[in-house]
Amino acid sequence: MTGSPLTWLSDQLFTMGVLSDALIWVVMLLFAAAGITEWYGRRSGTDLMQQARVTATTAWVGFGLFWLNSVPFWWFEHQSFVEALLALIGAPACFYAAYELYTGRTTLFVLSRAIAVMGFIYLPFETIPAITVGGVSLPAPRQYLIEVTTVITGWIISAAGYSPALVESPEGFMATYQWTLSDGHIYNVYIVLACTGLGSIAVFSGLIAAVRAPLSRKLRALAVAVPIIFVLNVFRTAFISIAAGNQLMHWFPDAVLFLFGETNPYRVSFLVSDRILSQLGAVVALMAITYLVVRELPELLTVLEDVLYLLTGEDHDLQAALELPREPVAEQPGASQGD
């Protein structure tokens, strides 16, 4: 029936909207509640492990449902095969984490705390809209971040010798670079939240915050991860804008259009530069950043080993495999302090 709750629910399933926003906020609150319960029980000597375990298990199940629900969005709407694949892998991994945590793998509490921190960093930018309080209009938090990223991206584009027009995006932000092609066609490149690097910054911040280590080393790890991620993202965004705005990667158009279910030939350069090259490059970059961060904060190895266990069902010793120290390099006995 038109306008019925069932109709609304069917419209909200397998996309990103009000239902998915509500679900992910509930999941993050459950992760946070589990972390606080486990921490309080440990600090006070009270046996609250069962309550924390049940809460965290529920959160993991909800997290799995969120990723499962998002797969069609990433595949069909966002046209990102990498993100769709990650969501498809993430859903059963979350269900498996719920099972493992409930049956006794308590090291997963660290990853649970990390996810809570990630969510509280990322979700305000993703879900909070512009509001008016007492007659004063407050922009959506995402607007600040997107427009700052747009300005910095523009500096890089200008330094490369290009000068597209900066116009308003569909969201109402000054965050679109408008290119005029040689045949007179107008092509717009939109700067969105994903271009800011916020997602990756939230992931590393959550992981760093969740482990037990001295604050000084956590800050050093953040100082390694956050600037690198942001700088790489603005250069990536500038690269995509230049490539798409000048049709520099109009490669194998028929194959690319078929692969992404597109018909617009002007989209080929964007799809190649963003959905293929940049996303594959991002995977490599994140692996390299992870290696650098772990050298500053070896406690993260436990979390990474848990993630690998969820994906493979086997325990791994990353310290031995990657020849990484369990102590940070600068703090190892006898470490060189310079020539």
Go through each PLM region and give its residues:
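Hydrophobic N-terminal alpha-helices or hydrophobic patches in metabolic proteins across all domains
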Residues: M1-D339
